[in-house]
Amino acid sequence: MQPESGANGTVIAEFILLGLLEAPGLQPVVFVLFLFAYLVTVRGNLSILAAVLVEPKLHTPMYFFLGNLSVLDVGCISVTVPSMLSRLLSRKRAVPCGACLTQLFFFHLFVGVDCFLLTAMAYDRFLAICRPLTYSTRMSQTVQRMLVAASWACAFTNALTHTVAMSTLNFCGPNVINHFYCDLPQLFQLSCSSTQLNELLLFAVGFIMAGTPMALIVISYIHVAAAVLRIRSVEGRKKAFSTCGSHLTVVAIFYGSGIFNYMRLGSTKLSDKDKAVGIFNTVINPMLNPIIYSFRNPDVQSAIWRMLTGRRSLA
């Protein structure tokens, strides 16, 4: 990210984030709402992580991935919300270019790992339902760790690629971002150099990072649905659909908001719709995930309850 002298000779070394609302009277309301959402998200995800760690009944591949997903949700919301709350308190909207790039990198890192981890969870459900006899060998602890490590490696490469590509652009004014965090679409519109290569890179990498995992998830659940429909027990079908339904809900929200956000780079002006999608990506998704998984999962509910009441599992 190359700061350059603008028309008046000043050097662009920072960006101005306008935030969600410009009305001063509504800033305290925004602060309270986002602080509440942040605390609920952190507590909910850490509760699931703690339950997975201490409850023997949850020491399975599915909950191993769920625990990792909880860590990612905490990381994702922590990249954007605390800095926004800090700006609301200090009433300072300026963000240095370096801090903007750092936020961009970590946001895409956590979102990228999330993308691959959701695919690993779909693969786990496919093996558990469609290949139950070989499930324990195909989804061993070594395989689980390899899937998580590969997710982090791919996401790190993706985040670093976009960050380095963004650092090559020139910014010579204006420097006002009509958003509450730094991301690719907003920065593209402020660049005074061509962003065609960056946008092409975003679409190409996005196809690999999002298109391939999405296709694998769809294929996995087509096989899962076919296998579940062959189950004679009504209770068995209900349990299988309940487990898969939670995951599919999270996948739909995650990919739906992501596609809307990054596939609209041709728009000439960012609107409040982009802010709403940004809230979904950074706040709503991490907050809903523990609610979705625990609400429809009696094992997680009972594990969290036993952990809170100090009771031990009989398993």
UniProtKB/Swiss-Prot annotation:
Task: List cystine links.
Answer: C100-C192
Membrane topology value = Multi-pass membrane protein
Gene Ontology MF term list: G protein-coupled receptor activity; olfactory receptor activity
Gene3D superfamilies, alphabetized: Rhodopsin 7-helix transmembrane proteins
Tell me which parts of the chain lie in the Cytoplasmic compartment.
53-60, 124-143, 224-240, 296-315
**Per its UniProt record, what InterPro entries does this chain match?**
GPCR_Rhodpsn, GPCR_Rhodpsn_7TM, Olfact_rcpt
Superkingdom of source = Eukaryota
Q: Which UniProt keywords apply?
A: Cell membrane, Disulfide bond, G-protein coupled receptor, Glycoprotein, Membrane, Olfaction, Receptor, Sensory transduction, Transducer, Transmembrane, Transmembrane helix
Q: Which residues lie on this side of the membrane: Extracellular?
A: 1-28, 83-103, 162-199, 265-275
Membrane-spanning regions, if any? 29-52, 61-82, 104-123, 144-161, 200-223, 241-264, 276-295
**Annotated Gene Ontology cellular component terms:** plasma membrane
Location(s) in or outside the cell = Cell membrane
Query: Which residues are modified by glycosylation?
Result: N8
One of the protein's GO biological processes? signal transduction
Family that this chain belongs to: Belongs to the G-protein coupled receptor 1 family.
What does the function comment of this entry state? Odorant receptor.
What name does the UniProt record give this protein?
Answer: Olfactory receptor 3A1
Organism of origin: Homo sapiens (Human)
High-level lineage = Eukaryota, Metazoa, Chordata, Craniata, Vertebrata
Gene designation: OR3A1
